[in-house]
Amino acid sequence: MEYLLQRITGEIAGSLRRAAVKAGYLDAEDELAFELEKPKEKAHGDLATNLAMLLTKKARKNPREIAATLLEYLEIPAVVERVEIAGPGFINFYFKKDWVVAVIPEILSFGEKYGRLAIGAGKRVQVEFVSANPTGLLHMGNGRGAALGDILANILTEAGYEVSREYYINDAGNQIENFNKSVEARYLELLGYKVEFPEEGYHGEDIIDTARNIVARFGDRFIHLPEKERQEALGKIALEEKLQSIKKSLENFGVKYDVWFSERSLHESGEVEKTVKLLLERGYLYEKDGALWFAASKLGEEKDEVLVRKNGVPTYYAADIAYHKNKFDRGFDLVINIWGADHHGHVSRMKTALKALGYDPERLIVILMQLVRLFQGGELVRMSKRTGQYITLDELVEEVGVDAARYFFVMRSHDAHLDFDLDLAKEKSNENPVYYIQYAHARIMSLYRQCNEQGVTLPPVEDVDLAILSSEAELNLLRHLAEFPVEIEKCATALAPHHLARYLHELAGYFHTFYNSCRVLGVEENLSKARLLLVEATRIVLRKGLKMLGVSAPEKM
């Protein structure tokens, strides 16, 4: 599916390629990727290309000379008013003023489907995100991962992919053993027994709360069980409670998963064992000091890794390899993991293991997410005033609301550290970016209430002369609306939701400027109708963009 700006861009790109062939700079079968996009400076036109600079090596001429020759052969589309050569050899395209009014009937005809793409048609993608240990509560870093993963899944769905959201439950291994022992210790303490708390146990208040809930439900029912059996029984109940708490926190944050995948199930089904056996058969395992080692160095890694300890217990790495094998065996074309930046060393290890198993490691994409810091009153907030421990996602949402939290978490690139300004997120002013965007939508709905009071209805688009929209404020808003599908494509291909957050903030800015300088009601009839249709097109895009972010579009503020 191609939209107005994409069609124009495609037409110009084709014309540039043909000009390069006619000028002898390219052979007809040559493939050359060149940029043709909106320049950063408005003075440089509507689209700019670096094609001339990419042809210097083959043409053996300077880029400005190449650009001049290209212009001699260029078929200029009707929408283009003029073409200029700038700087070292950029070719800038300036469109006629009225080209962009055609975006209004396009948006109105597509409605909520405006911006939907087919770049992912027929492809299945899995996005695995958060996957926090179920031994504690979700913190702010998990919140950033939740917003990033959920919004990215929304964007990929809009780009035509079939998307599955997945949470990997780390319910096996040493951490669960320590968790079980911690719950048992707190349980026994609450029942009046003196116990030594496990050295590597979990000390959080939430573990005491969990143990208290178990005592309230079951009393001393587990006291007389053998120690190991008691630990497992208590741990199982506690883990289920923790998992339900995590699910509730995420649902409150607007995140719902398609699959909750248990690490324990990989061990119980024998998948870990089968994966280890397959690596052995493919010649990538060897025995040393009684343990089984993965010969990762054969495939370029710095060192080999233990997969099965000498006591016969598989490592976490072995389970993780089995999990990723399972993902690809489920038929996903692309597997996306969202991990904290502290996992960066694990990325190449996982890709190497997939290669050893015979899978294409390029089908695994790992997004590494940087840390979040919370600020209030200009100072770093390290601990919750309420609990004296780390600040949970629930506490943050209670403080600023879902809308602000989700927006703030994705308004910076995932690979940049995020300083979350608590005061700004709560502010009801134009300084708060999410408020600023939502206020644009609320202003539109307020205008519609005025229309309703005055008996004004939305006119059929074919009855309105849209060319009357010619002021700078109107044209800037129209151009930005035309860029919406391009932004979705950019977000989907770069796996970068922050572009959508930025786009909506800019769109709100263009709308507020238009609203403050162009009256919609009480002006000449055709102008009023044209502006009303522009407002409706803006409403559709604003509402859809906010929905993709999982942020509400209020009717009143």
Swiss-Prot record:
<dbReference type="GO" id="GO:0006420">
    <property type="term" value="P:arginyl-tRNA aminoacylation"/>
</dbReference>
<comment type="similarity">
    <text>Belongs to the class-I aminoacyl-tRNA synthetase family.</text>
</comment>
<comment type="subunit">
    <text>Monomer.</text>
</comment>
<dbReference type="GO" id="GO:0005737">
    <property type="term" value="C:cytoplasm"/>
</dbReference>
<protein>
    <recommendedName>
        <fullName>Arginine--tRNA ligase</fullName>
        <ecNumber>6.1.1.19</ecNumber>
    </recommendedName>
</protein>
<dbReference type="InterPro" id="IPR036695">
    <property type="entry name" value="Arg-tRNA-synth_N_sf"/>
</dbReference>
<dbReference type="InterPro" id="IPR009080">
    <property type="entry name" value="tRNAsynth_Ia_anticodon-bd"/>
</dbReference>
<feature type="short sequence motif" description="'HIGH' region">
    <location>
        <begin position="132"/>
        <end position="142"/>
    </location>
</feature>
<dbReference type="InterPro" id="IPR014729">
    <property type="entry name" value="Rossmann-like_a/b/a_fold"/>
</dbReference>
<keyword id="KW-0963">Cytoplasm</keyword>
<dbReference type="InterPro" id="IPR008909">
    <property type="entry name" value="DALR_anticod-bd"/>
</dbReference>
<keyword id="KW-0648">Protein biosynthesis</keyword>
<dbReference type="Pfam" id="PF03485">
    <property type="entry name" value="Arg_tRNA_synt_N"/>
</dbReference>
<dbReference type="InterPro" id="IPR001278">
    <property type="entry name" value="Arg-tRNA-ligase"/>
</dbReference>
<dbReference type="InterPro" id="IPR005148">
    <property type="entry name" value="Arg-tRNA-synth_N"/>
</dbReference>
<keyword id="KW-0547">Nucleotide-binding</keyword>
<dbReference type="InterPro" id="IPR001412">
    <property type="entry name" value="aa-tRNA-synth_I_CS"/>
</dbReference>
<dbReference type="InterPro" id="IPR035684">
    <property type="entry name" value="ArgRS_core"/>
</dbReference>
<keyword id="KW-0436">Ligase</keyword>
<dbReference type="Pfam" id="PF00750">
    <property type="entry name" value="tRNA-synt_1d"/>
</dbReference>
<keyword id="KW-0030">Aminoacyl-tRNA synthetase</keyword>
<dbReference type="Pfam" id="PF05746">
    <property type="entry name" value="DALR_1"/>
</dbReference>
<dbReference type="GO" id="GO:0004814">
    <property type="term" value="F:arginine-tRNA ligase activity"/>
</dbReference>
<keyword id="KW-0067">ATP-binding</keyword>
<dbReference type="GO" id="GO:0005524">
    <property type="term" value="F:ATP binding"/>
</dbReference>
